[in-house]
């Protein structure tokens, strides 16, 4: 377990400001002042895709038609750029919004896990909540027929394994309404998902190809790489970083938790991997939450692991203060939970979205950096901004 002493030789907020100055010329960080025009080279490989490594290909077959490839569907032909679209989860919806396609959204597969509050911080960026609320759980053939979309950003294998579809149902909608194109990427622990996975930015690149928005994708990829580079350069040495346990439990008075392994590499854990944390489950035989594994850990189990930081998903509509006043307060008064190091040090935080797209990931990475390394990046509720909201908004709205 890492020492939590403030008398550390690791980076301080002054150290971070030097990194801030290094990229202010590129508009990455707001609120910094510097004459420096130096921009660090990205070290994050997430967005460095190539033709050989990625199936995000667009092949012109006629002047206006093109094809896009993604497992498990394979190659899909488009006669024109889709105007009406729907996504199953918030990650793919966020990708389409990032590409300037918000007006074409007709609904979503799961509105309860599509968090749109982040758009409030981006001038000119929004989604129509009435549309989402009118079609919040689009999962049946009848709904797909009714909405008449031009593309369905759904993994059809997910429909088969979670919602009792069969192959004929998928083929029927793909033939009579519009194709499916999507891959369930938020975790990598489901036995039925025996085909290729994609990183967040590989999937984003594919969606960009669907909407023929290469320039917007590349602008986001550049911003992302610069942002992650700056954050990683500000991190403490590896042996001074906290051990982190990521869990799910939506109750305000939680008694048991579903565990996540960070080495699962699903996109829902991307910010924690980028922040270089030590997975508290490493070296244990505890398995990642999946379709078949619904096991939970009680407080006695958590005490055996005793992470420096405990992250709890399921509270993303609560503010940091509301989370502390409910979940953390309950743990502090609990006879067993109160013995946890994370509880005693007040290091129990919201764990981030289950489904995150490129816009959401920027906000979640910023929040995670402030949660885990407040001496460097400012506390969770500080006014520090680690990326430029206006730059993001300009990419989305096309004003870059």
Predicted regions and their residues:
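Terminal disorder- and signal-encoded targeting elements
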Residues: 1-400
